Amino acid sequence: MSGQEKRLMVMAGGTGGHVFPGLAVAHHLMDQGWQVRWLGTADRMEADLVPKNGIEIDFIRISGLRGKGIKAQLLAPVRIFNAWRQARAIMKRFQPDVVLGMGGYVSGPGGLAAWSLGIPVVLHEQNGIAGLTNKWLAKIAKKVMQAFPGAFPHADVVGNPVRTDVLALPLPGQRLVGRHGPIRVLVVGGSQGARVLNQTMPQVAAKLGDAVTIWHQSGKGGQQTVQQAYAAAGQPQHKVTEFIDDMAAAYAWADVVVCRSGALTVSEIAAAGLPALFVPFQHKDRQQYWNALPLEKAGAAKILEQPEFTVEAVASTLASWDRETLLDMAERARGASIPDATERVAEEVSAVALAR
């Protein structure tokens, strides 16, 4: 099979943690001559983001059940069946050689549709604990990969595909050696922000004073409130932005990151070679805790669960990290990363397609 003949359908949606790694693999294979289409939902971020990346997208109607009422749960089998039929019709038209499930609700009916048509299914689990959809699909998949050890007992650990501009950053030894002055603290709560960070970090800044300079991403609608909180704490000099468009530049600026531990965030921080103080989102399966644990075990990060994320604990932790410690942690972070994750996932997809 030549590169010109290969066809891939990527199934991913809902959040950047699913969509961005899928885009990285898609572009890598498109550069090798693959035809790529995307299966997503019309009301989530992939609907805009995927076409902007030059990839055609097909939509099915599916959403999650968590937090829904009894009526929605009773209707779930009908909705899943309808989504499966939609996905099956789309795949019959496109005839992919392989489908790649990167997570999100769309992967469930999409993976079942591919399997019912004899199209091999490849899965990539971004998180340290497998989601329900991927647990089901793993039973029918030809290949299962995981970003962090432990999500599946026997799956290959391949890392998370991250953006090329993050991978292109200078290594910690080049970037951090010779820095002096206040420790540069990057605070990132994700695109939606994180209330615990927005409420706690201005008080941390007051405790640490001139020892730190902070760049704080507040999330949508939070900039003015967080700026006022820093000013009220006597720390108006710190930079607060609603979003950070160029995360690679922010990582290059930082000495340490204080953030949630979503899968893609953890992988990007490791690839950038940065120490981190993680405050995992409190989810019932502790997904973000398991994402962050490998970097803590590597000596590259510290985890403070949300009840422990107090002004005193955060200030004490940051104050204990001098520049020598931060450089050592940064090098450990980079050493724990898998910078060729995109290539590893793409190679497995190619191998499954060639084995048909």
UniProtKB/Swiss-Prot annotation:
Gene3D superfamilies: Glycogen Phosphorylase B. Keywords: Cell cycle, Cell division, Cell inner membrane, Cell membrane, Cell shape, Cell wall biogenesis/degradation, Glycosyltransferase, Membrane, Peptidoglycan synthesis, Transferase. It is an enzyme of class 2 (transferase). InterPro entries: GlcNAc_MurG (IPR006009), Glyco_trans_28_C (IPR007235), GlycoTrans_28_N (IPR004276). UDP-N-acetyl-alpha-D-glucosamine binds at T15, G16, G17, N127, R163, S191, I244, A263, L264, T265, V266, S267, E268, Q288. The keyword Glycosyltransferase applies. It catalyses: di-trans,octa-cis-undecaprenyl diphospho-N-acetyl-alpha-D-muramoyl-L-alanyl-D-glutamyl-meso-2,6-diaminopimeloyl-D-alanyl-D-alanine + UDP-N-acetyl-alpha-D-glucosamine = di-trans,octa-cis-undecaprenyl diphospho-[N-acetyl-alpha-D-glucosaminyl-(1->4)]-N-acetyl-alpha-D-muramoyl-L-alanyl-D-glutamyl-meso-2,6-diaminopimeloyl-D-alanyl-D-alanine + UDP + H(+). One of its GO terms (biological process) is lipid glycosylation. It holds the Pfam family Glyco_transf_28. It is found in: Cell inner membrane. GO terms for cellular component: plasma membrane. It is a peripheral membrane protein. GO terms for molecular function: UDP-N-acetyl-D-glucosamine:N-acetylmuramoyl-L-alanyl-D-glutamyl-meso-2,6-diaminopimelyl-D-alanyl-D-alanine-diphosphoundecaprenol 4-beta-N-acetylglucosaminlytransferase activity; undecaprenyldiphospho-muramoylpentapeptide beta-N-acetylglucosaminyltransferase activity. Cell wall formation. Catalyzes the transfer of a GlcNAc subunit on undecaprenyl-pyrophosphoryl-MurNAc-pentapeptide (lipid intermediate I) to form undecaprenyl-pyrophosphoryl-MurNAc-(pentapeptide)GlcNAc (lipid intermediate II). PANTHER family: GLYCOSYLTRANSFERASE, UDP-N-ACETYLGLUCOSAMINE--N-ACETYLMURAMYL-(PENTAPEPTIDE) PYROPHOSPHORYL-UNDECAPRENOL N-ACETYLGLUCOSAMINE TRANSFERASE 1. This is UDP-N-acetylglucosamine--N-acetylmuramyl-(pentapeptide) pyrophosphoryl-undecaprenol N-acetylglucosamine transferase. It comes from Klebsiella pneumoniae (strain 342). The lineage of its organism: Bacteria, Pseudomonadati, Pseudomonadota, Gammaproteobacteria, Enterobacterales.
